[in-house]
Amino acid sequence: MSDERRLPGSAVGWLVCGGLSLLANAWGILSVGAKQKKWKPLEFLLCTLAATHMLNVAVPIATYSVVQLRRQRPDFEWNEGLCKVFVSTFYTLTLATCFSVTSLSYHRMWMVCWPVNYRLSNAKKQAVHTVMGIWMVSFILSALPAVGWHDTSERFYTHGCRFIVAEIGLGFGVCFLLLVGGSVAMGVICTAIALFQTLAVQVGRQADRRAFTVPTIVVEDAQGKRRSSIDGSEPAKTSLQTTGLVTTIVFIYDCLMGFPVLVVSFSSLRADASAPWMALCVLWCSVAQALLLPVFLWACDRYRADLKAVREKCMALMANDEESDDETSLEGGISPDLVLERSLDYGYGGDFVALDRMAKYEISALEGGLPQLYPLRPLQEDKMQYLQVPPTRRFSHDDADVWAAVPLPAFLPRWGSGEDLAALAHLVLPAGPERRRASLLAFAEDAPPSRARRRSAESLLSLRPSALDSGPRGARDSPPGSPRRRPGPGPRSASASLLPDAFALTAFECEPQALRRPPGPFPAAPAAPDGADPGEAPTPPSSAQRSPGPRPSAHSHAGSLRPGLSASWGEPGGLRAAGGGGSTSSFLSSPSESSGYATLHSDSLGSAS
């Protein structure tokens, strides 16, 4: 008891240092949060470690200091409940600190050695799960002495509060020693690997400027809303600073807490007794490491924030004005065809669609009634890359009824000219099992074989909505149909304004794969009248004034349109040989001054419109 009476002399120092550590760690957490726009795994682990230090000096160390000061009075002594609370909280926070430092070093090694795998493996979620596991294991093991896992012959709370592991019990002491020793060893190994890899990369970057870098990838939906993002490679200076900070934290912890706790625990278990110097060593080391962590955070320029930034962060937190960060990293590989810089703004109206003929396109699927046209632009390493997630991909869990899951756009009831674009996308889309069933183009797979005319140039004649096939009565009595709920095949016709003699969508060497079909023979047809363009359909006498009745059948136009369909239109040279130089250039006019897009003009393709 005389040795324990020397402990109250250090209680005042513990309280003062504990108060300073509490304020410093709180400032460190605010500084890290103010310097970062969103929470990242490494910053999250640093803040968790600082919060663990705050709890350690606020609960067990403060409790022990106050009790030691109160013990100077003869009428006060430790009781069983207070001693159990102190032992459980102290060892819980000691183990949590040890595991947090090891997790910090492991995440840094993972990020430095395997940067792509680290960014694609949802490291943020793994860091959260790691912290939850750390606290669960630490609490379960440290709470066992309070419920009976201790030496029953002489309990640790009978004479004062002897919290060294040898006084608690042999089983608890061995488990605690193994956990702390293994965690310290793993932290040292991970830190050494991360430091070596960082220095090697720095030397390699100086020797080779073409070092591999991970691009910053931002995931957005079809409406442009940011869903998630993947951070790119760190700059050389930032990477070196962060690795140096983690190395310093691990080194200081091992020197001030890891190895001293191992030495004290092993010595007490070997001697089966505890000494006053053991309690003094463990408590002072805990306070010292809690004081040094904010100093290291302030020394790193990446996490050093001024008073103004911290004040703005606090005001944003109190006003709940901070944007909600629901972004999560991708949980797997990224399909290369989804990596886009941005989606193309497409125009819609009447019988034309605006296209940029200087870009290469692919018509992915009908989402919301119109094909989405994406420019395939070359990836740039110094810019963010964007992933476009279509609505049906996001609602893939409810693809039984895609019309109920995806809100229909306002222009969908006007299915007349919109279906022309649908059939156009059907012609150039590749057929096969890779087509998504949730897409609106799935109606083409359910059609009878008589409608599957993708290999013939006359399939361009199937551009007519089903509402016109049923006559004026059916068009008035029934709402406009959708591609998935359209009735079976029937005689259909199309406007001649969409039929050029040569289908020049873009530069032919950049055409989609569906347009690269081998040339096939076409049936002979009467020649075009004199004075008319070979690729232009002859205008019937009644075409100047449209009749309100239904359009004529497709067979009535086939004969007049076949002369303009060249048998060699699948070859690059066939674009000029089919209808001369006028038809190809008139199909895509020059870009306008306002938008810069080329426009499909119906008056240059025929006179039926």
Curated annotation (Swiss-Prot):
Alphabetized InterPro entries for the sequence: GCR_153/162 (IPR022347), GPCR_Rhodpsn (IPR000276), GPCR_Rhodpsn_7TM (IPR017452), GPR153 (IPR022335)
Keyword Ribonucleoprotein: no
Function as written in the Swiss-Prot or TrEMBL entry: Orphan receptor.
Designated name of the protein: Probable G-protein coupled receptor 153
Protein keywords: Cell membrane, G-protein coupled receptor, Membrane, Receptor, Transducer, Transmembrane, Transmembrane helix
Record's subcellular location: Cell membrane
PANTHER family, per the entry: G-PROTEIN COUPLED RECEPTOR 153, 162, G-PROTEIN COUPLED RECEPTOR 153-RELATED
Biased composition (Gly residues): 571-583
Keyword Cell wall biogenesis/degradation attached: no
One GO molecular-function entry: G protein-coupled receptor activity
UniProt topological domain (Extracellular) ranges: 1-11, 63-84, 148-175, 265-276
Family, similarity comment: Belongs to the G-protein coupled receptor 1 family.
Domain of life (superkingdom): Eukaryota
Major subcellular location class: membrane
GO CC aspect terms: plasma membrane
Topological domain ranges for the Cytoplasmic compartment: 33-41, 106-126, 197-243, 298-609
Source species of the chain: Homo sapiens (Human)
Membrane-spanning intervals of the chain: 12-32, 42-62, 85-105, 127-147, 176-196, 244-264, 277-297
Biased composition (Low complexity): 458-479, 527-536, 584-596
Ranges for region Disordered: 446-496, 514-609
Pfam annotation, one family: 7tm_1
Membrane topology classification: Multi-pass membrane protein
